[in-house]
């Protein structure tokens, strides 16, 4: 859905205008129909995630707080930042959070973009919530290295606003990009970023063929464990902070570090 919506957003001005309106409605919970559609998508997404977690033997008992959880804190956080003279309106009519020695975070888009909030807005609300309400002393963001500047900005605002003190440890745990055999960003057969479930399925197909070639009988459970275990180990054996090639041929070698 996101891919189709992104394409329509980039190529259809009417769709783009509608998207700005719907986004603001979601953030303010001001349209029951819009919220109902989002709720349906959200539930289906969570169900899909849980299926992947189950395949990876990851607990489903997770405390999930997505962006929507923090919408109700936006006005409060805006007031806190305004009181500290950290918010201003730029030449384009956007509300921005001014940051020491770096570019600002856009807090609210301009009127021609629906006055909607950005993920920077909800990240600020999440940081405030985690540090002042949950009283978290350590906060880790496991996100790819391309977001390094964003988290530098985020943590600077947290410190300037007084949410992050010397007692807090906030860190961006950056990881590299997954590459294909050709050294380019890993993509599926249709040229898009692959889903983890697709990678697992491909691994299972590979192991199934490998056992068949060796005339080895194996249960579906064993095949699944070998495939998923190999994927996990291969990923964890690489340096977290650097890019690496994802190659089933190397991953399934019976010799070497596999």
Task: Name the predicted role of every residue range.
Residues 1-258:
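NTP-dependent nucleotidyl-transfer catalytic core
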